[in-house]
C-alpha cells in the first residue's frame, strides 16, 4: 500500500472503532437505564469531541476507548453468563488494554478484587482469567526483559501519568513538554543518554515528575 492509502485505511479503521464504541456504550447503558435513556446517553456520547477529532488523526485514543468500553461490556456479560467463551474474550481484551495503557493494570486489579470479594465469579474462573491475561502480555514483557533487563509492560506509563498530572492538564490531559512552563523537564529529557535504556530512562523522568506533582498537591492531582 502507498503511504496515503495506508493513512486512509488507518482513518477508516478508527472511524469504524469509534462508531462501534457508541454501540458498546449503548449496550452498557442498558444495564442501568431504559432503552430511551440509553439512546439519549449514546447520542450525547457520540458527539463528544474525543469521538470526533481522534478519527481524523493518527492516535491510539480510538482503540483505547473501544477496548475500554468492550472491557466493561464483557465484564457485565461475564457476570451474567460465565461461559468459557466470555472468560476468554474478557481476558484477551483485558490483556490488550494493559498493553495499550500500562496504568490500566491498576484498574484491572481493582476490578479483579471487586469480583473476588463479591463472589461474582468463582475462584477457578478467576484463575483462568489471570492465566489468559498473563499469556497475552507475556511476549511483550519477555521482550522488554531481554532488551532492558527489567520486567516492564509498557514504556510510556510515566509519560501517560504525567499528561494527566501536570499544571496544564485538563480533562483530556496535556502532553506538550517543549514549552517554557516545562523548561526544567525538557532539559532533563534532552540530557538522557541515547543508549539501550533510553526509552526507560526517558519515561522514568515523567514518572518521577508526575509522582512529585501528586505528592505536593494530592487533592488536585490524585
Question: Residue spans of the language-model regions?
Answer:
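Loop-to-helix entry region of an early transmembrane alpha helix in multi-pass inner-membrane enzymes
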Residues: 2-20, 39-42, 54-57
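Transmembrane-helix motifs of polytopic, lipid-linked glycan transferases
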Residues: 12-32, 70, 74
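Short helix- or helix-capping micro-motifs
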Residues: 15, 38-49, 53, 64-66, ...
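Membrane-interface transmembrane helices that cradle and orient dolichyl/undecaprenyl
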Residues: 32-35, 71-89, 116-120
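Membrane-interface alpha helices of multi-pass inner-membrane proteins
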Residues: 42-46, 86-101, 111-113, 132-136, ...
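Perimembrane helix-loop-helix junctions
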Residues: 77-80, 107-134
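Membrane-proximal stem/loop segments at transmembrane-domain junctions that anchor or position
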Residues: 148-222
